[in-house]
Amino acid sequence: MAKAVNLPIILYNIPARTGNKLLPETVQALCRDVENIVGAKDSSGDIENLKAYIRLTRELDKEVAILAGNDGAILTCLKEGGAGGIAGRANIWPETVAKIYDCFKAGDLEGAQAAQDAIAILQQTFK
């Protein structure tokens, strides 16, 4: 399908909804072999899987955006070299979620961690 369109494609790993896991090696191969696949969002909840996406796509001859799909993994994704996250809770707390990215990019790791921690606290209010 990706080869049939002239649009950038981001792969989406959400095994809880699909029943299938998009393996890191598969993400690497698809990003390598299909020009317009430009990234992947990992909502598996498996930090090691997210890290493997980042590590394996870093080996490619093109820039690939790896995004955390779990709100609690945004800062980890950034620290590992990923592009950030697409967070569901950003719809409710956009400033707090954006602050994780903004602080990280500014070199303020304490501020980024505080914002990441705030998301975890806010999440607890909805359980």
Residue ranges and their predicted role:
Residues A2-L7, R17-K127:
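Catalytic alpha/beta core domains of metabolic enzymes, predominantly
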Residues N13-I14:
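Conserved C-terminal portion of the radical SAM core fold
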